[in-house]
């Protein structure tokens, strides 16, 4: 597993203050998603991890939708920092 995949965009002092913020939650979900993706490259038949990955992806998608409605500027900054594609709109 490559450690460069995990991002440290948020400084340590901000991590301690804002653990409940939307940005921090999306940041944590992104790290979990990248870790699970790396795991699933080696263990293709780990169906429980696949299910967990889909659940985390859904949670992150809902948080990003909330953030895009509330504050579009912070949403664009976060997507740029975490290198996440913007979801397609229906």
UniProtKB/Swiss-Prot annotation:
Disulphide bridges, residue numbers: none
List locations, semicolon-separated: Plastid, Chloroplast
Q: Which UniProt keywords apply?
A: Chloroplast, Plastid, Ribonucleoprotein, Ribosomal protein
Q: Which domain of life is it from?
A: Eukaryota
| Gene Ontology BP, a term | translation
Tell me one Pfam family matched here: Ribosomal_S15
Task: Give the Gene3D superfamilies listed for this entry.
Answer: S15/NS1, RNA-binding
InterPro entries found in the cross-reference section: Ribosomal_uS15, Ribosomal_uS15_bac-type, uS15_NS1_RNA-bd_sf
Q: Which GO terms of the cellular component aspect does the record hold?
A: chloroplast; ribonucleoprotein complex; ribosome
Q: Care to name a GO molecular-function term for this sequence? A: structural constituent of ribosome
> For this UniProt entry, what is the primary localization, expressed as one broad class?
plastid
**NCBIfam families reported for this sequence:** S15_bact
Q: Give the family this protein belongs to, as stated in its UniProt record.
A: Belongs to the universal ribosomal protein uS15 family.
Q: How does it assemble?
A: Part of the 30S ribosomal subunit.
Its name, as the record gives it, is Small ribosomal subunit protein uS15c
Biological source species: Drimys granadensis
Q: Which gene encodes it?
A: rps15
């Amino acid at each position: 597993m490559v450690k460069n995949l995990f991002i440290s965009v948020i400084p340590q002092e901000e991590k301690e203050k804002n653990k409940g913020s939307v940005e921090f939650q999306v940041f944590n979900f992104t790290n979990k998603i990248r870790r699970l993706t790396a795991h699933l490259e080696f263990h293709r038949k780990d169906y429980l991890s696949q299910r967990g990955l889909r659940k985390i992806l859904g949670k992150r998608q809902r948080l990003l939708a909330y953030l895009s409605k509330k504050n579009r500027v912070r949403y664009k900054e976060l997507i740029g920092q975490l290198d996440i594609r913007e979801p397609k709109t229906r």
